[in-house]
Amino acid sequence: MQTRRETLKQSAVVAGLLASAGFPQFAHAAFNKAAFDAKGVQDAVKAAGGGAIAESKDVTITGPDIAENGAVVPLGASTSLPGVKQMLILVEKNPAALVAMFHVSDAVEANFSTRAKMGQSSDVYAVAIMADGKALYAKKEVKVTLGGCGG
């Protein structure tokens, strides 16, 4: 007869196998390789599904004026506009401009933050891609004193 301990151990093994079989497919499903491989801001926005970018006072980008360590630069993007499909954070002079892509639903407020690696001083963009494909942006210059990309 099987003991309770053996039953729990076998159940944990089965649950682990089932979980590991399904999750990797979902983790890779939302990755947009073309957008993250794009070299320029406009190319990344286009690959993410947006059109030509236009500046907007309704989109905000937050970050330091001077980043002492380019390896961990705190950046934020937000907007109160309705109908936002995606929010992007881009660093113009990084080898790959797109730093972060956030998918937005109607149930979520479009207010995101992350930390980025910056190799040099650059303009940083927050781009809101709307449901109709319009891409609205805000821009901020961040000066880096110590490079994060091998500097």
Feature-to-residue mapping (PLM):
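Short beta-strand edge segments in extracellular beta-sheet folds
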Residues: 141-147
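N-terminal secretory signal peptides and thylakoid transit peptides that target proteins
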Residues: 1-18
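Short edge beta-strand/loop segments characteristic of extracellular beta-sandwich folds
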Residues: 62, 74-80
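Transition segment at domain starts
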Residues: 30-68, 100-102
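An anionic, turn-rich surface loop/hairpin at beta-sheet edges
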Residues: 93-118
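Sec/Tat signal peptide C-region and signal peptidase I cleavage site
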Residues: 23-29
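Extracellular Ig-like/FN3 beta-sandwich strand-entry sites
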Residues: 119-123
